[in-house]
From Swiss-Prot:
Residues 39-58 are annotated as: Disordered. Transmembrane segments: none annotated. Residues 43-58 have a biased composition (Basic residues). Keywords: Ribonucleoprotein, Ribosomal protein. GO terms for biological process: translation. GO terms for molecular function: structural constituent of ribosome. This is Small ribosomal subunit protein bS21. Belongs to the bacterial ribosomal protein bS21 family. The gene is rpsU.
């Protein structure tokens, strides 16, 4: 779990920005969004192959 220590006199906005960067780096928000709804294995497989095809076409 990411944490940020706020020093005396440090703006809260700066601490929030640092916290958001840490959360993005660890992928916590992305994982939470992916676990929000259940995806059937066939749907996951189809999305994965579609993403791979899109990547190959570049």
């Amino acid at each position: 779990m990411p944490s940020v220590k706020v020093r005396v006199g440090e703006p809260v906005d700066r601490a929030l920005r640092i916290l958001k960067k840490k959360i993005d780096k660890e992928g916590i928000l992305k994982a939470a969004k992916s676990h929000r709804f259940y995806d059937k294995p066939s749907v996951k497989k189809r999305a994965k192959s579609k993403a791979a095809a899109k990547y190959r076409s570049r």
